[in-house]
């Protein structure tokens, strides 16, 4: 794998397109999709779903957990082992690193603060976080961070591991949030804020710092007080400076050049604080989606923002339509619109998506051993296809 590919993984903690290998970019819209326009969903096929997660060769993985919910049916399944040393089978209640699914929690808390009048979406970030961003970034607002239209420049001056061995060697490198922000604020803006969209983890590192500033306590404490405890998410944590996963969990592994696997479960998460550092379970993530989509966490006007893409003239840097809203991403699979998020850390990959009306939700967590070689989204593709394709004989795009 190239130096640049490893660096992208270290920077974002999620897939570059965040959803997968075969997803056609959906048409951007400035308003939510009408629920009546949603196509029919297929009945659940337990055998096919189990076969899809049993295929731990595509991509090479050590384990998988799948939880399907919603009014159209429920199913749970597991495959593989949580620990290759002990060969302990994975269960449906294992903790794992959620990667960029963290952003759903952070965006929700920021919007709660907006609802309380403690911050405004159009507030310049420099005003909320004095002295952190240079003067030339004065046009960047809180809203621009949350929907990835900030235009912040690329990181410079950070380690760029070239091999899996180097990734493993640097797994305990530690950064303060302000040190990490400084690596992405040296150059000029890549585009005028609000005019283009580029998925960047640094946007949510800043969003977490905003939560720190507005609430007067670390963002993890705010997430726990506002979301984790009220919703009973007892197995979801913001780890802070602790590189370990406590309690029953799935180990993550990374394939080395000699073909062996190294346990990369214990890993410093300081560079992804607020954008990819949380730990959870499939049950807890399903509960979070249910509460969010049901309107338990936000007033209607702010909840609509999470299902609203930027205007049609705001496009991704590659010219494709925008696909990120405030805290979520949109994917269209076999004509079915899904909202949610993918996440990725070394040894961990997952997806949490739902139709807007919650007829179908799914949380998938699996454990590829490759360092993002372009094929790691194959399991997400299989599952999303099975859960949305009404005609089993038809082809279709996948998340």
Please give the residue ranges for each predicted region.
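C-terminal segment of classical bacterial N-terminal signal peptides
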Residues: 20-27
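Short active-site loop at a secondary-structure junction
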Residues: 60-62, 86-143, 191-200, 273
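Catalytic loop of the DD-peptidase/beta-lactamase superfamily, centered on the K-T-G motif
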Residues: 30-78, 265-399
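Short, surface-exposed loop or secondary-structure junction motifs
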Residues: 74-76, 136-338, 342
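Hydrophobic (often cysteine-bearing) scaffold residues that line and stabilize catalytic clefts
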Residues: 45, 49, 98, 102, ...
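N-terminal secretory signal peptides and thylakoid transit peptides that target proteins
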Residues: 1-14
């Amino acid at each position: 794998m190239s130096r640049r590919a490893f660096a992208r993984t270290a920077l974002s903690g999620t897939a570059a397109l965040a959803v997968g290998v075969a997803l056609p970019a959906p048409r951007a819209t400035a308003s939510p999709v009408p629920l009546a326009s949603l196509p029919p969903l297929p009945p659940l096929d337990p055998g096919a779903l189990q076969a899809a997660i049993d295929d731990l060769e595509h991509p090479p993985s050590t384990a998988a957990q799948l939880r399907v919910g919603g009014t159209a049916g429920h199913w749970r399944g597991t495959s593989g082992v949580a620990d290759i040393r002990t060969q302990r089978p994975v269960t449906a209640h294992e903790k794992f690193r959620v990667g960029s699914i963290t952003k759903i929690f952070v965006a929700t808390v920021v919007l709660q603060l907006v609802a309380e009048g403690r911050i405004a979406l159009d507030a310049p970030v420099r005003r909320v976080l004095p002295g952190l961003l240079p003067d030339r970034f004065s046009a960047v607002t809180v809203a621009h961070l949350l929907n990835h239209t900030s235009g912040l420049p690329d990181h410079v001056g950070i380690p760029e591991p070239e091999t899996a061995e180097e990734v493993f060697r640097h797994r305990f490198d530690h950064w303060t949030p302000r040190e990490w922000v400084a690596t992405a604020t040296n150059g000029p803006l890549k585009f005028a804020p609000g005019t283009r969209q580029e998925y960047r983890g640094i946007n949510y590192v800043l969003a977490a710092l905003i939560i720190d500033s507005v609430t007067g306590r670390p963002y993890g404490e705010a997430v726990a007080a506002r979301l984790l405890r009220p919703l009973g998410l007892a197995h979801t944590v913001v780890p802070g400076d602790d590189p370990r996963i406590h309690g029953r969990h799935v180990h993550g592994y990374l394939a080395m050049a000699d073909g062996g696997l190294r346990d990369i479960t214990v890993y410093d998460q300081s560079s992804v604080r607020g954008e990819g550092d949380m730990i959870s379970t499939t049950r807890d993530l399903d509960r979070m989606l249910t509460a969010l989509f049901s309107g338990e966490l936000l007033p209607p006007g702010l909840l609509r923002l999470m299902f609203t893409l930027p205007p049609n003239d705001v496009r991704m840097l590659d010219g494709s339509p925008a696909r990120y809203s405030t805290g979520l991403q949109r994917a269209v699979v076999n004509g079915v619109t899904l909202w949610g998020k993918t996440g990725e850390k070394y040894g961990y990959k997952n997806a949490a998506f739902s139709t807007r009306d919650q007829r179908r939700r799914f949380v998938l967590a699996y454990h590829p051993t490759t360092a993002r070689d372009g094929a790691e989204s194959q399991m997400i593709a299989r599952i999303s296809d099975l859960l949305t394709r009404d005609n089993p004989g038809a082809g279709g795009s996948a998340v």
